[in-house]
Amino acid sequence: MIIFIFLQQEEGLVFGGGEPLLYSAFIKEFIKKYTKTGWKFTLETSLSVKKESIENIIHCIDYFIVDTKDMDKTRYELYTKGSYDLFLSNLKYLLETVGADKIRVRVPKIPKLNTYKSVKILLPVKLY
C-alpha cells in the first residue's frame, strides 16, 4: 500500500498518491491517532470508489481536492476508463454532506479532450 502523506508548512497533512480512498480505514485510524496535533487533513481523490469508502472518513477530512478529467460523461469515460455515474454520484454526495467551500475540483487542460463548456457545471465549487 502506498499513501503519500505531505506535511504542509507544519499545519496539516494531505493524503494522496494513487487513490487514497481505497485505504479509508487506514486513513481514519491515522487521523484518530493524530487529531490532537491540530493539523488539518486534506484528501486528494478521483472519487472513483464505492460510496462507503467516502462515508467512512468524510467527517475526518477538513478539505477535499477532487481530480477529474472532464464533466462530459463520454469524454470522462473515454479518458479514465471509469464510471462517470459513480464519480458524479460521489461528487454530489460530497457536496451535499460537506459543502462546496470544503471542496476544490481540479481539471487539467487536456488538448483535444476538455473545454470550458464541458467543465462549467463545476462553477458552484472551486475549480482549479
Task: Please report, for each region that a protein language model flagged, where it lies by residue.
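Conserved AdoMet/S-adenosylmethionine-binding subsite of the radical SAM
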Residues: 2-128
